Amino acid sequence: LPASQFARAKELEAKAFRKILRTLKSNFDHVLIDAPAGIERSLRGLLSNEINECVLVCTPDDVCIRNAERTASVMRKKGLTAQRVIVNRLNPDYIRRGEMYAAQTVALTLDMPLLGEIPEDAEIYRALLHHQSVMEGESEGRNAIARIALRMTTDEDVPLPEYGQKRTLFQRLFQRRKKGDEKHVR
């Protein structure tokens, strides 16, 4: 469900919202609900026992992290303890220079398991501008989203990349390639 385009989120009644959720849950394995940044007082009433898990998506900046902390606190008070975080719009160069928090730092700050990290990706932005699926084509952002989807829908152990982490010369020389590659070093 996309984020509300209403002038005020309170225009959506909690009872109607729960009915919509029940209908969707009976037809789909997963229902993702987008919400505006933060959690307004009017949105708090929409939280219901129909929601099984909260996945907070935030960018690695102080304002967004504080907002995510407040949202997580409200969710916990409402009894929703299954929470994970996705860190969006990571820039590896900024992380290496210490100008941006790494995804693991954000997850530790929020005291939530890290579901995934999505790098800043011009291809994702271009797809959004052209109203195309971000899953078409090949890009690092698309691959990150696919890994997150796998983590959400399977028990498969999907490794988390570490955008912006410094690697030693030894790590760069002898890092294993993906399964199926002929060479074992890159």
Predicted regions and their residues:
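Proteins with a high burden of low-complexity, intrinsically disordered sequence enriched in S/T/G/P/A and R
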Residues: 1-10, 28, 40, 99, ...
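P-loop/Walker-type NTP enzyme "switch/lid" segment
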Residues: 1-26, 126-130, 134-135
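Conserved catalytic-core segment of NTP-binding enzymes
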Residues: 15-26, 30-120, 126
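C-terminal lobe/tail of nucleotide-utilizing enzymes
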Residues: 77-186
